[in-house]
Amino acid sequence: MFNGKQIKAKNQYFNKEISRLKSCLSNNQKSSKQIKNLYNKRNNQLTDIFHKLSKRIVNLLVENKIGNLVVGYNKGWKDSINLGKRNNQTFVSISYEKLINYLKYKCEMIGINLIINEESYTSKCDSLALEEIKKHDAYLGKRIKRGLFQSSIGKLIYADVNGSLNILRKVVNDSEIISKIINSGWLFRPIRVNIL
């Protein structure tokens, strides 16, 4: 599990600075050289981080002889959303699509199959109970606090891991393979890796 705190912190810092500078502009002014420079600096730093992250992911796939990478993505995911001042500063301008494009070309170069799949209802459905991934009136498991999912089988799992397994389940319809992954135990002890 890659730690996204560095990306979020950088993005929030730049967005806060840009917002501060915009508040100092006169009414008829839309931008300034300083704001444009900050946008460029943020974009360059995020591009660098995404290149490094995509390279690390692809290297892990090669080291572990994995030929397929499944990625969840919803088109228009962050378009016209308002998550509140703090979350907008942190998340909205992080280009997940850019990361996917870097993964795509790096995977193609070495023959790894990249599968991009939509991820609706993957965070709400209980992956450990193999709950059908669709809209339900009541879901088997539930998120009990930020980042932690309580499965209906009585186990706790990181919410991101639950969602990731469900994204994989949407692509791999083989319940035997999914059961092997669940029974391997690594889902309950993910290793957090810093990007940089």
Task: Report the location of each language-model feature.
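Positively charged, helix-rich recognition surfaces that bind polyanionic ligands
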Residues: M1-L196
